[in-house]
């Protein structure tokens, strides 16, 4: 595994999160283990900053948490702040809008905002014993419509209803059986997969990702998708992919 070449974090309120680079894989780690990686407004703003750094440079972004869990939810000392809700929504949407693959590496608790962050990512690797759930109804809170639609789409309607209405939790193994977790494993497994994914054609990935989001948004003939699709077909990577196939060798994609 390639060593991190660069690390960036913040000292405000202690280190809240870091961004490490392993070649063209960005590894974003929430670092509030004393709060079980519960996110506050400052953490969310930092995640948004990292999203922008990853845009145009990363082929894969891996999101994980330090210590014993992925993210135990929102830091309840500030969740009532209207700015927090706006920051959370922007952060979740930000992961879906990145052109690169986003991959959540989940262990321990992924509750509330933790589950929201996980389902906002394109792919999920989780340990069998990791715990997913949205216990908002136990707190008298309500998640936004985007989250409800995303959880229903990624986890299935029945599981979404049980999470949101019954406040039930699911293990990583249970969600893997249902297809909501794509692979069972630990962070090293997620990073190994990420480095493989980073070898795929980035323009194609961006087009397919936009197309998947357009399907989710029920957009037909989405102009942004069609533009990316045309770019993929006309790209040097497309020529390289076809040439490598004919020459029976591994393609070397440059993102051009």
Locate the predicted segments by residue.
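Short helix- or helix-capping micro-motifs
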Residues: 73-74, 151, 159-168
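Conserved CoA-thioester-binding segment of acyl-CoA-metabolizing enzymes
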Residues: 1-66
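Well-ordered beta-strand positions
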Residues: 123, 162, 166-168, 174, ...
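Glycine-rich beta-to-alpha active-site loop
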Residues: 94-140, 169
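Glycine-rich phosphate-binding loop at the start of an alpha helix
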Residues: 85, 89, 112, 142-145, ...
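Glycine- (often His-adjacent) and acidic-residue-rich active-site loop
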Residues: 45, 57, 64-97, 110, ...
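C-terminal long alpha-helix characteristic of the crotonase
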Residues: 33, 125-130, 178-223, 234-236, ...
């Amino acid at each position: 595994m390639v060593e991190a070449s660069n690390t960036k974090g913040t000292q405000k309120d202690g280190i809240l999160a870091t961004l490490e680079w392993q070649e063209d894989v960005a590894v974003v780690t929430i670092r509030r283990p004393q709060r079980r990686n519960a996110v506050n407004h400052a953490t969310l703003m930092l995640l948004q900053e990292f999203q922008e750094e990853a845009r145009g440079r990363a082929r894969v972004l891996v999101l994980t948490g330090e210590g014993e869990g992925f993210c135990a939810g929102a830091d309840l000392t500030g969740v009532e702040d209207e700015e927090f809700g706006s920051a959370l929504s922007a952060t979740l949407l930000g992961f879906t809008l990145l052109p690169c693959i986003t991959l959540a590496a989940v262990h321990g608790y992924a509750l509330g905002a933790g589950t929201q962050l996980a389902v906002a990512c394109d792919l999920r690797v989780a340990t069998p014993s990791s715990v997913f759930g949205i216990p908002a109804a136990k707190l008298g809170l309500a998640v936004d419509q985007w989250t409800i639609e995303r959880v229903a789409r990624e986890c299935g309607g029945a599981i979404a209803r049980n999470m949101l209405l019954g406040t039930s939790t699911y293990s990583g193994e249970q969600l893997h059986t249902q297809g909501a977790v794509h692979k069972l494993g630990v962070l090293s497994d997620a990073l190994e997969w990420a480095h493989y994914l980073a070898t795929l054609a980035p323009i194609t990935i961006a087009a397919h990702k936009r197309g998947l989001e357009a399907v989710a948004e029920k957009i037909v003939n989405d102009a942004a998708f069609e533009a990316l699709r045309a770019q993929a077909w006309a790209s040097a990577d497309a020529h390289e992919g076809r040439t490598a196939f004919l020459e029976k060798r591994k393609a070397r994609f440059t993102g051009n």
